[in-house]
Amino acid sequence: MSGFYHKHFLKLLDFTPAELNSLLQLAAKLKADKKSGKEEAKLTGKNIALIFEKDSTRTRCSFEVAAYDQGARVTYLGPSGSQIGHKESIKDTARVLGRMYDGIQYRGYGQEIAETLAEYAGVPVWNGLTNEFHPTQLLADLLTMQEHLPGKAFNEMTLVYAGDARNNMGNSMLEAAALTGLDLRLVAPQACWPEAALVTECRALAQQNGGNITLTEDVAKGVEGADFIYTDVWVSMGEAKEKWAERIALLRDYQVNSKMMQLTGNPEVKFLHCLPAFHDDQTTLGKKMAEEFGLHGGMEVTDEVFESAASIVFDQAENRMHTIKAVMVATLSK
């Protein structure tokens, strides 16, 4: 995959549909090779820096395991482990790390930080999550969808995202639909729709590739005929408590539950979630939500749906590692 060598991976629209498909094919091959014991290390001797301004379970573990599988070594720089943007400029950090490492992963805040790292590092930079985009998650999602509907092309699939679509997940889903021709439906209150300019750009590209993008507040209309229903958390521990009540009131009708799944009219519909999910009362935040807002048995998704046979969330989680491995192999090996 010489066309990817030394490229950055910052957002999906930096690539063509053919390039995205190549990454997915590589991920599927690497996954099969690992499971059959035939994986060949392509990154032996490579050193990789993992910058995490925001903590993560899946992203960190995915990058570390993928790197180790491929013979690379990693250095983890956590929220308190680097001076990026505080005592040292992003530009200077990029130039320092670029002299020591072969690739840099960034998970943190503004997209402009990842772009500045990419501009000055001189080595591939990969976006593990920014406020605006989460491209590695969408790679995993697309691979998972292919695995569960192997007889369908993306432009024959319908993906529903229910809940708060004005975040990095909503933005990256728009970009994924633009490149693949998915029938993407963002089912959300209008206050939670993505920026109109990105919607317009991605809708035009999606239509060129045989798909469409729909934004609607109507749950029944939005989920009809869906192959996949996707959601994400409504609130996080870092948000002010006053925001919780406001967000829950806004999104309560968009909870993924058995009724929503049935409204699809598709007995084979699958449930997706990028995790972590507040589907029960077994976490600190989940318990608080249950006590203060009566959300027993789940917030953005009910425990019933999360634990059902329709749920493929742990296939998604595993595929984070395989798709991230594909990105590293494609950009670091000739």
Swiss-Prot record:
Protein keywords: Amino-acid biosynthesis, Arginine biosynthesis, Cytoplasm, Transferase
The record's NCBIfam families line, in alphabetical order, gives:
orni_carb_tr, PRK12562.1
GO BP terms: namely: arginine biosynthetic process via ornithine; citrulline biosynthetic process; L-arginine biosynthetic process
How is this protein named in the record? Ornithine carbamoyltransferase
Q: Which reaction does it catalyse?
A: carbamoyl phosphate + L-ornithine = L-citrulline + phosphate + H(+)
Record PROSITE patterns: CARBAMOYLTRANSFERASE
The gene coding this protein? argI
Q: HAMAP family per the record?
A: OTCase (MF_01109)
* Enzyme Commission no: 2.1.3.3
- Gene Ontology MF terms: amino acid binding; ornithine carbamoyltransferase activity
Q: Where does L-ornithine bind?
A: N168, D232, S236, M237
Protein family per UniProt:
Belongs to the aspartate/ornithine carbamoyltransferase superfamily. OTCase family.
